[in-house]
Structures are given as C-alpha cells and as structure tokens.
Amino acid sequence: MSPLECSECFGDQLLHKTYTWHLTLHSRPNFTRKRDTRSESLEIPVNVILPQRGTEPFLRLHNLYSTPRCSRQAALPRMSRRVASQHSYPLNRFSSMPFDPMERPTSQADLELDYNPPRVQLSDEMFVFQDGRWVNESCRLQPPYFSPPSSFHHKLHHRRLAKEYQLQEENKSLRDENRALRDENKALRKENKILQVFWEEHKVTLGHEESQTSSLLHKDTTSQEVVKRDNTTLPAQRSKESTLQLIREENRALQQLLEQRQAYWAQAEENAASTEEGKSTSSPKEESHNSGLLPDQSTNHSSPFEDPKVPPTTQEDSKTLRALREMVNNLSGASGEEDGKVGPNLPDSAQPLQLLREMNQALQALQEENRLLQEENRALHILREEHRVFQEENKALWENNKLKLQQRLVIDTVTEVTARMEMLIEELYAFMPAKNNKDPKKPSRV
C-alpha cells in the first residue's frame, strides 16, 4: 500500500499533490573522429510530491514508465562507449534530498510499482539512478539494504501526530494556568488599591495626632525655654543694673569730692594767707608769751585737713571714701578685697590723700586719652585738608584737559575751513580768465 493511498495515517485518498517534469539529457557529438557527428538524448521524469498535512516537500527522480512513452524514445539507441559524454559532473552532482532530514525518501520499489531505473554509460562505467542519485552499477546497493520498510512512514507520521497532540495539550494547560494567574493578579491589584486607600486614611489620622502632640510639645518646650531664658537673663540684668547703679553712685561721689576739695583748698589757701600776714605783724615777744599755747595750737592745727570750722566735711569724705572702696571691692576681685582690708587701718588724715592720688591718676589717664584723641583728630583734619587739596587739583586738571580738548577741536575746525577756502580760491582762479599772462596773487591766510 503506497502513501498516496494511505487511509490510516491521513484519512483521505488524495492527500498529496504530485507534479511531474521530464528532464531530457542531450549528449554532445564526439569530434575525435570526423565521421561520428551523431547526438543522443535521454528523457528522465522528475516526480515532486507536495504533502498537505504537516510534512515537508521533497524531490524524487523516478522512471515511472516501464515502456517508452513515444516512438521516438523507443527508436533511440543506447548510449555506447564511443558516443558517451566526457562531462559527467551534472549527473554526479545532481541529487535528490528531502527538505526534512528526519524523513527518508520512499523509493518506487517500496511503492510496489514497475520500476526500471535509468542507466547512463559514461566512459567505461555504467551509472544507475537509485534513490535520488547516480550510483555506479558495480557499487549498487541491494533494495533490502537501502530501502526502508513500508511501515516506517506510518510510524514516523504517528509519532509526529502524537507529539503535536502532546504539545497542544500542554499549550491548553499553560493557557488555563495563565488565565488563573491573571485572575489572581487582578484580585491582588484590587486588594492592593483598597489597602492603599486604608493606609492613606490611617496616615492622615496619624498626621493629625502627631501635629497635635507636636504642637503641645512645642508649647511645653517654648514655655520651658522662656523660663530658662528668664532665669538666665534675670541675674545678668540684675548684675548689669547693680554695676550701673554702682557706677552712678561712684560718679556722684566723685563729683561731691571734687566740689568739697575745691572749697576746702580755697578755704585752706585763705587761712594760709591770713596766718602769714599775722606772723609778719606779730612780734617776738608775743611769740615768747604765747609759746605755752603753741603745742596745743600745733596739736589742734597739726594737719591742714583737720579744720575745726568744717567737721562735717571730714565725715562726709570718710563716708564717700568707704562707699567708693566698697564699690571698687565689688567690681574688682581679691585685690580689691585686700585693699579694703588695709584701707580702714589707715588714719583718717591719709584717706583723703590716697583718694586724691587715685583721682589724680584717673585724671592723668583721661588727659592722656584726650591728648591721643586730639592728635587723631588733628591727623584727620590734616587728611581732610589734603583730600580737599587733591580734589581741587583734580578739578583743575579736569578743567584744563577739557579746555585742551576744546582748543584741539577749534584748531582742527579752523584748519579744515582754511583748507576748504584755499581749494575754493584755487578753483575760482582756475575759472577766471588770465590778464596779460600774469599769475594772480594769492590772498594771505586768514
């Protein structure tokens, strides 16, 4: 049973399209001998089978006709050794291979047809067309060796159908799994969207709570910071106020001391002048009589600072001195405390002297600073004068440059005008007629 009539594999009677072409091989004449100019031809049918179900096309060369098709073919003699063609490469290279390497072509002997393979004699050898290629007749294989059994084609096709069926089943199962996975993916996306909405709502509520707690914490922290600042600024403000108050009291005390000293020194000078006048007028007798009273007077007038007429001034001086020393001790550190300890041990007569010395030192320092400031002020005045002088010089130079530029412009315009006038005069004299062949005198330049 041939594959063209197989109903078990394909289910139809006509499942292949068969196309047949006839190849005609013409042999050239052999010109080695002058008399032999004959040419012979050989006709070979080519059968091409195109299957319709899943198989691939392949080419077969067969001699489908046991008898010659026409009288001309029957009349053709066999190719002899003498007229054989020298060129055998078309026959040696011409082969028939199936397009599918898994399928072996079915020979015409397997199809149980009458089969006479074509033969060609080239040179001394005979070639037979067997299984799609030209084979030497001496090396020709027997049909049981090279031809597959008749059931090979059916088994191969059944295997292919089984593989295709398995692949289709696998594709169906994979499609079902893909659909199930898509459905699960859709459900998970919906759940994800719902969870995102819930999370945003929860986030908003958490943000409100955090803002409330943060506002409360911020208020608490601000109140604590304000309290801390107050606590830190209060002693600083108190210390500043105390120092300012001490400085004010010190200034007032210094002013009072200066006023008292001025009045005291003026009164002392008057007393000294009156005593000198009294001494000059008094006689030596009176001095001898009053010698007993001199020690008392000397004791009473031992220091110029002890004036019996002005007892409250000394008390005020001592009070102010003590206040000043206390302020100095408060402002200065341990050195001031040591001075305060030593100060009260001094006698009352030395306290105003020490105060005057300190005031004198302060005044000298202030005078030195004032002198330095005056020198700086003088230097600044000198610099201002120099700057003013430089400005005046720059202004004068700028005016001078401006005048020079104007002068240059005027000179350039005058030269240009004179040049044009000369050109015009020359043109006028050129147009004027000559008189007695005398050259006209050119006018002088303006």
Swiss-Prot record:
<feature type="modified residue" description="Phosphoserine">
    <location>
        <position position="332"/>
    </location>
</feature>
<dbReference type="GO" id="GO:0031410">
    <property type="term" value="C:cytoplasmic vesicle"/>
</dbReference>
<feature type="modified residue" description="Phosphoserine">
    <location>
        <position position="223"/>
    </location>
</feature>
<comment type="similarity">
    <text>Belongs to the chibby family. SPERT subfamily.</text>
</comment>
<feature type="modified residue" description="Phosphoserine">
    <location>
        <position position="147"/>
    </location>
</feature>
<comment type="subunit">
    <text>Homodimer. Binds to NEK1.</text>
</comment>
<feature type="region of interest" description="Disordered">
    <location>
        <begin position="268"/>
        <end position="317"/>
    </location>
</feature>
<feature type="modified residue" description="Phosphoserine">
    <location>
        <position position="211"/>
    </location>
</feature>
<feature type="modified residue" description="Phosphoserine">
    <location>
        <position position="85"/>
    </location>
</feature>
<feature type="modified residue" description="Phosphoserine">
    <location>
        <position position="88"/>
    </location>
</feature>
<feature type="coiled-coil region">
    <location>
        <begin position="236"/>
        <end position="264"/>
    </location>
</feature>
<keyword id="KW-0175">Coiled coil</keyword>
<feature type="modified residue" description="Phosphoserine">
    <location>
        <position position="96"/>
    </location>
</feature>
<protein>
    <recommendedName>
        <fullName>Protein chibby homolog 2</fullName>
    </recommendedName>
</protein>
<dbReference type="InterPro" id="IPR028118">
    <property type="entry name" value="Chibby_fam"/>
</dbReference>
<dbReference type="Pfam" id="PF14645">
    <property type="entry name" value="Chibby"/>
</dbReference>
<feature type="compositionally biased region" description="Basic and acidic residues">
    <location>
        <begin position="276"/>
        <end position="289"/>
    </location>
</feature>
<feature type="region of interest" description="Disordered">
    <location>
        <begin position="208"/>
        <end position="243"/>
    </location>
</feature>
<keyword id="KW-0597">Phosphoprotein</keyword>
<feature type="coiled-coil region">
    <location>
        <begin position="161"/>
        <end position="197"/>
    </location>
</feature>
<feature type="coiled-coil region">
    <location>
        <begin position="353"/>
        <end position="411"/>
    </location>
</feature>
<feature type="modified residue" description="Phosphoserine">
    <location>
        <position position="274"/>
    </location>
</feature>
<feature type="modified residue" description="Phosphoserine">
    <location>
        <position position="41"/>
    </location>
</feature>
<feature type="modified residue" description="Phosphoserine">
    <location>
        <position position="123"/>
    </location>
</feature>
<feature type="modified residue" description="Phosphoserine">
    <location>
        <position position="335"/>
    </location>
</feature>
<feature type="compositionally biased region" description="Basic and acidic residues">
    <location>
        <begin position="208"/>
        <end position="231"/>
    </location>
</feature>
